[in-house]
Amino acid sequence: MMQQQRLKQQQQQALMQQSLYHPGLLAPPQIEPILSGNLPPGFDSSTCRSVYVGNIHPQVTEPLLQEVFASTGPLEGCKLIRKDKSSYGFVDYFDRRSAALAIVTLNGRHLFGQPIKVNWAYASAQREDTSNHYNIFVGDLSPEVTDATLFACFSVYTSCSDARVMWDQKTGRSRGFGFVSFRNQQEAQSAINDLNGKWLGSRQIRCNWAAKGAGAVGEQNSDAKSVVELTSGTSDDGQEKVVNEDAPENNPQYTTVYVGNLAPEVTSVDLHRHFHALGAGVIEDVRIQRDKGFGFVRYSSHAEAARAIQLGNARLLFGKPVKCSWGSKPTPPGSSSNPLPPPAIGQIPGLSAMDLAAYQRQLALAKMAGAQAFMQPQGQRIGAPGQGIYDGGYGGIASTQPPMYF
């Protein structure tokens, strides 16, 4: 009996040891991490002995960080750069193998309930300055898509200079969109035209021009400029100046979708039906300014609103492609209301019987959580150069209705 237990323990240890390595790729003496982070194109890690650590909880101290990373090998140095919301740091090893082992085993490890990001550290000069490059937005990314995957997809265009997936700082998961930079404007436009609606991973991606400043992925952070910068596939920590945490796309208090370019005949009921059919989440309120051609749809959560923006942007409503972005004001805590009841299915002006039947089928599938399968046909994804995905909506709207936070 004891011998069986000992054999079982040895098997479990062997399985744990195997999990440290990329399956079927490298033997233990050649351990190499899976490069899923945001490294410069052509980055060579063969001589690296330092790792970047991002998304560090504010309660983590430098001695604790040193203790955690010493588990994979002796350290030459350890530096923690403190920030109010999340810190970052750099760990230097005496040998490359220990650094590689740290990336494989410690990336995603929770410290005080917050997953840390670990990847190779590199000099700022190794990354090309993309501040004057042409940036495109790539939405509806599947969870498995990394910076490396995104760059590989767009690198068929020779002027592609950088690619970054936006990650949730608290969960460590992809937020479902990213940005790609190009040196040549025409190639950026070609990428939008050619790859919009194409499959990447398990989803069809949506491509459009990024809002001005949103895709400035090449900007450097002053704290890390002279040493190393972000390499973990996020735009937080070492890139805090690139992604503003108060911006609507990063602030969980923003739950309202601005909907522009509405046809004059669109009513609040029509708008409700349109967004309910997307199946993005629970709708709490719908408002419309018919004389100005725009409206607002408030969801119960930030994630649902983001999903609605991705699914709804450029979809046709009464023959016009609507423009979806974030509302300009956050929803104050405690102001959420009960979900709106599902809209009644009735005859929709401007639609043929065939269109209405298709809408009803789409609505039924949305209720079964199948709305993700509904993507507008390629020809209906209308996006003009310069059209931003997140442009903040409009404020200062006079209304006699109860206050809704746009």
From Swiss-Prot:
Residues 231-250 are annotated as: Disordered. Pfam families: RRM_1 (PF00076). Keywords: mRNA processing, Nucleus, Repeat, RNA-binding. It is found in: Nucleus. The keyword Repeat applies. InterPro entries: Nucleotide-bd_a/b_plait_sf, RBD_domain_sf, RBM42_RBP45_47-like, RRM_dom, RRM_dom_euk. Heterogeneous nuclear ribonucleoprotein (hnRNP)-like protein that acts as a component of the pre-mRNA processing machinery. Functions to facilitate the nuclear maturation of plant pre-mRNAs. Binds with high affinity to RNA molecules that contain AU-rich regions. May bind to the 3'-UTR and protects the mRNA against exonucleolytic degradation. Associates with nuclear poly(A)+ RNA in nucleus in vivo. Does not stimulate transcription or the 3' end cleavage/polyadenylation reaction. This is Oligouridylate-binding protein 1. It comes from Nicotiana plumbaginifolia. The gene is UBP1.
